[in-house]
Amino acid sequence: MPVTTQQLIQWKQQGRSIVALTAWDYTIAQILDGAGVDLILVGDSMAVMLGYKTTLPITLEEMLHHAKAVCRGVQRALVVVDLPFLTYQESIPQAINSAGRILKETGAQAVKLEGGYPAMVDTINRLVQAGIPVMGHVGLTPQSVHQLGLRQQGKTQETAQRILNEAIALEQAGVFSIVLEHIPADLAMQITQKVNIPTIGIGAGSHCDGQVLVTSDVLGLSERQPPFAKVYTNLRETITKAVQDYAAEVRDRQFPE
């Protein structure tokens, strides 16, 4: 049975951890879905896979293109798509149009927006009223890289309280889940205990209701990984060796036999 947003909330109540990873193409999405991943995020981190230095340049059209491919490969997992930078911050109508296009054109079940400041809370509330499921995202928000950098957030009492307040406000606005990125584990635990919706951690300790990582980091494909990522295999090395072996056989006329 396909995973739903309501099922994620039930899993929090039952104490069942939620498994999430990113995907940007049909093949990886199919593999993740078949392996039992609960939530697949078509993240704007795809920008880095396309050669950009940050997530900012990725466009809505690029996200739509890749989200369609991901959805074609998924039968069970809940698919959530990031709204890219400046496709939802300008106005509520812009956000509704962008999010609506993602749901209508890709087959995804939800969108994710960054930030919990008052204007964003209002935007999310309107999206939810329009029938669009929304996942929130607080802590380190990569679309604010030029304001906040990529350092851990919430280390001071003031910033920790702000992030906690944002998470509570997002729940009240109607999000079905919140990503907690690169914040202290004790703050993530406090938020997880305070809200009734599942928290999905990335660099936020082990007390969240679920975990998400970038799949290229997990598989060892990335040139560099964030400090909180765990590399489970080194596909970059495996692929390099396979290509070198193929090239050697072609040059030596050993392939094809």
From Swiss-Prot:
Pathway membership, UniProt: Cofactor biosynthesis; (R)-pantothenate biosynthesis; (R)-pantoate from 3-methyl-2-oxobutanoate: step 1/2
One of the Pfam families matching this protein, by short name: Pantoate_transf
Domain of life: Bacteria
Catalytic activity, reaction form: 3-methyl-2-oxobutanoate + (6R)-5,10-methylene-5,6,7,8-tetrahydrofolate + H2O = 2-dehydropantoate + (6S)-5,6,7,8-tetrahydrofolate
SUPFAM superfamilies: Phosphoenolpyruvate/pyruvate domain (SSF51621)
Molecular function via GO: 3-methyl-2-oxobutanoate hydroxymethyltransferase activity; magnesium ion binding
Keyword tags: Cytoplasm, Magnesium, Metal-binding, Pantothenate biosynthesis, Transferase
Major localization class: cytoplasm
EC number per UniProt: 2.1.2.11
Cofactor(s), names only, from the UniProt record: Mg(2+)
Disulfide bond residue pairs: none
InterPro entries reported in the protein's UniProt record: Pantoate_hydroxy_MeTrfase (IPR003700), Pyrv/PenolPyrv_kinase-like_dom (IPR015813), Pyrv_kinase-like_dom_sf (IPR040442)
UniProt record, GO biological process: pantothenate biosynthetic process
Entry GO CC: cytoplasm
Residues holding 3-methyl-2-oxobutanoate: D44, S45, D82, K112
TM stretches of this protein: none
Cofactor note as given: Binds 1 Mg(2+) ion per subunit.
CDD domains per UniProt: KPHMT-like
Active site: E181
Subcellular location: Cytoplasm
Positions contributing to Mg(2+) binding: D44, D82, E114
Function: Catalyzes the reversible reaction in which hydroxymethyl group from 5,10-methylenetetrahydrofolate is transferred onto alpha-ketoisovalerate to form ketopantoate.
Similarity-based family: Belongs to the PanB family.
The protein's assembly and partners: Homodecamer; pentamer of dimers.
Name recorded for this polypeptide: 3-methyl-2-oxobutanoate hydroxymethyltransferase
Lineage, uppermost ranks: Bacteria, Bacillati, Cyanobacteriota, Cyanophyceae, Nostocales
Gene, per the UniProt record: panB
